[in-house]
Design a protein with these regions (language model features):
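Transmembrane-helix motifs of polytopic, lipid-linked glycan transferases
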Residues: 100, 104-125, 133-135, 164
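Hydrophobic/aromatic-rich transmembrane helices and adjacent perimembrane loops
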Residues: 290-333
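Signature aromatic-anchored transmembrane alpha helix within multi-pass, membrane-resident enzymes
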Residues: 23-27, 215-219, 330-358
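Hydrophobic, aromatic-rich transmembrane alpha-helices
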Residues: 266-293, 297-300
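Start-transfer (signal-anchor) and selected internal transmembrane alpha helices
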Residues: 1-35, 119, 128-131
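Specific aromatic-rich, kink-prone transmembrane helix
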Residues: 116-119, 137, 156-180, 197-199
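Short acidic/glycine- and proline-prone juxtamembrane loop motifs at membrane-interface regions
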Residues: 146-155
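Extracytosolic helix-loop segments that constitute the early lumenal/periplasmic catalytic or substrate-binding loops
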Residues: 52-77, 84-85
Length: 480
């Protein structure tokens, strides 16, 4: 008689960790990261930069107006960053309010970065444990967590095309690689520089005809963004100023700013995350794919010179670096010590983030301090937002954290934010009262003074003036 398989058998028991790895990672991400961010969004916790910018872009983008004017940012969306990947998230606005369309879109892009790895697993090229480990890096690393904690930015979305490109590179799927590059370039203009380095990598690998094609695509994209775009769309935001910051103090001062401990600690965290994989590769005598790792050079240079390692800036760097370990992970069983040590590093490097998010889950009525989920506060905000949304005529001056809630309304501006040069007179004012609300770059004292100034005007019609919100109609000029 043939014995039947038993769930308690040692072989079956050893398979359970591999089977559960990816579901547990996704569950932890959904509960400990996505849910707290969405709770905070529902409580109006996030400033106009960057959530309000991209929510207003999605709300106003259409076939008739593909490059909408963002009144609160005082720029056309593609004259700021060139990130046409936004078009893929635009259909969500049909079924969801703009702010939720943006948040759901960002979460979907982050989660879909795991899909190419699942495809490798289905083909028998990655073990379940390896897939779960890479997913943990992509979804739960400090860079990924802080990117979602600072919504929204298409740089975060670039994890998906970076993983697609890495898989296509290692499998020599040139068609897939080309599609991945187009999606990657559409996330932010800087990624076309990585295309130049990928051209070099392909040339070194002997794929010279395809290398020429990738090089042409990259150069055409760069020429379009930095040459044709200003000619067609008008002046673009000059982000090169960040790269030059500190040059007036001399070379030593310039380098000292970029080598400050706050920046080096971020680099150290990225290196530490990859240390177990690096040690394992050394023990297995698997050489890094130096050709692929060339794509990291432009991003490293831009982040070093621009002192930009936090939030969404680390996501593409980590995603691209992880793809350099595919030759190591392909067809190999990941040692337990790599899984455990990597998991512990992810956990402890996220200690502050997880503590904050756990407080949001367990004490959302009182935390975060500047935007508690107190029912009376939320009711005041809802009443104020409803009035401004119903009266769509006249410029409205809003607290920074209200821009995303009213993104589909014309003529909205943020207190303390960019303003028109024409000395705009605002018909509506809606702000939170300190100590609540997002007031940067102002102070709570200045916002209190502005409320007193607006209230004292003889022509002001005060509509809400409770403990939480100030809403008034009149003629207002002071905005900072």
């Amino acid at each position: 008689m043939t014995p039947s398989a038993d769930d308690s058998s040692p072989g079956r028991a050893r398979r359970w960790p591999g089977l559960l790895a990816l579901p547990l990672v996704v569950l932890a991400w959904a509960v400990l990261v996505v849910a707290p961010v969405w709770i905070q969004a529902a409580h109006a916790c996030f400033a106009h930069f960057d959530l309000g910018i991209y929510v207003q872009a999605l709300a106003r983008m259409s076939l008739a107006d593909p490059n909408p004017w963002l009144s609160a940012r005082q720029v056309y969306i593609f004259n700021d960053h060139f990130d046409p990947i936004l078009v893929l998230a635009r259909p969500l606005v049909v079924v969801l309010p703009p702010m939720w369309a943006a948040l759901v879109g960002e979460a979907l892009f982050a989660l879909l970065a795991v899909a190419p790895l699942l495809w490798l697993q289905a083909r028998g090229l990655l073990s379940r444990a390896a897939t779960g480990l890479l997913a943990a890096f992509l979804l739960l690393s400090p860079s990924a967590v802080e990117a979602l904690k600072f919504p929204i930015h298409p740089t975060t979305w670039s994890a998906l095309p970076w993983v697609m490109a890495g898989v296509a590179w290692h499998l020599r799927r040139n068609g897939w690689l080309l599609v991945s590059l187009v999606l990657l370039f559409a996330c932010k203009e800087e990624f076309a520089f990585a295309g130049i380095m990928l051209t070099v990598a392909l040339w070194l690998r002997g794929e010279r005809r395809f290398a020429v094609g990738v090089g042409v695509l990259s150069l055409v994209w760069l020429a379009g963004v930095y040459g044709l775009r200003p000619w067609l769309l008008g002046p673009s935001e000059d982000y090169s100023l960040r790269l030059k910051q500190g040059m007036d103090g001399g070379l030593l001062h310039y380098l000292a700013l970029r080598l400050a401990p706050v920046h080096l600690s971020r680099v150290g965290t990225l290196v530490l995350l990859l240390l177990p994989l690096g040690v394992w590769a050394w023990r297995e005598r698997v050489k890094p794919d130096w050709a692929w790792l060339l794509v990291l050079l432009p991003m490293l240079g831009i982040r070093f010179l621009g002192m930009a390692w936090r939030f969404h800036y680390g996501v593409p760097l980590l995603a691209a670096a992880l793809m350099g370990f595919l030759p190591l992970l392909r067809g190999r069983k990941v040692p337990a010590w790599v899984l455990v040590s990597s998991g512990l590093i992810i956990l402890f490097s996220n200690e502050l983030n997880l503590r904050q998010f756990t407080r949001t889950l367990t004490s959302s009525r009182t935390y975060p301090r500047q935007c508690p989920g107190d029912p009376s506060r939320l009711d005041s905000i809802a009443r104020g937002v409803e009035v401004i949304a119903r009266h769509r005529e006249g410029p409205a001056l809003l607290g920074s954290n209200f821009v995303s809630l009213l993104a589909d309304r014309d003529d909205i501006y943020a207190v303390g934010g960019p303003q028109p040069d024409d000395g705009r007179v605002y018909e509506w004012v809606l702000v939170e009262k300190p100590p609540h609300g997002e007031v940067y770059p102002l102070t709570y004292e200045r916002v209190t003074a502005l409320i007193d100034l607006w209230r004292a005007d003889a022509g002001t019609e005060v509509l809400i003036d409770d403990a939480n919100v100030f809403l008034a109609r009149g003629r207002f000029t002071a905005h900072r």
